Design a protein with these regions (language model features):
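A charge-rich, low-complexity, intrinsically flexible signal that marks solvent-exposed coils, linkers
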Residues: 2-76
Length: 76
């Protein structure tokens, strides 16, 4: 189940996220949904993304800078 991203900075493109064991599903403000996995984006990046998602700040910036095109699949 996707959880609303806290967006503490107030200007994130991330709207919702779902944390799964080896991956994350991210919904952006344009309604697109991407799945990032350990295999596609590296386990270290997925771990960092999970921490940023829970913290509610920095996830969109991290994705843009580090894993933007390294998704496993576009869902929507």
């Amino acid at each position: 189940m996707m959880v609303r991203y806290k967006n503490l900075s107030g200007d994130s493109k991330v709207v919702k996220y779902e944390i799964v064991k080896d991956s994350m599903k991210i919904r952006f403000s344009d309604s697109s949904v991407y799945i990032y996995t350990n295999q596609s984006a590296d386990p270290g990046n997925i771990s960092k993304m999970k921490a940023l998602a829970v913290a509610g700040k920095g996830l969109g910036t991290f994705i843009d800078a580090n894993v933007k095109d390294r998704f496993a699949r576009k869902v929507r």
